[in-house]
């Protein structure tokens, strides 16, 4: 059982990426300025109340996951919130893991990086190792290159899970395909450099934002990509 925590606004998406496939829709706000976010105190109280209730009912979570409709590391109090979560986890369900789903762009901030290194599972996005594909697929609102993202991910020294979404089709009249030989070759080289504990490979499963004709990648193709990762000695997980 996973207990999800959303640090973004309830009624809008807060993210510095605007991924063309995002199930949360298009990004309306790319920074936290002027946005009302749950306070560290509110998150602490809500999490403690939920964990206490689960303890009373004998329902233990396997993992406490920071995800939601946006990028959790954009919350200005994420280091303290993670510290609070670890304390509460240890108090109520010490066997549960804490996970963060992130696009890794905030890893260059020392306090954020140190906070993420404390959690059990960092599940971090890398949809491509090519600059142009990142620009089209992820549409970051800052100038960030594939090399910068890869260097960010290398800072975890293998203590992370890479999550990659593969898709094909068209978006705003442009061909979309991050499964070409060129894409896979560059991506595999990046995976080898990062040397993660695991790679999660998946494709779209829900409706995507308007403006595109995006297609799922067949399971057989995903499994083939996974087999190439396995040859690097890295564990893989395929879904979709």
Where are these regions (language model features)?
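Conserved Radical SAM active-site core
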Residues: 21-118
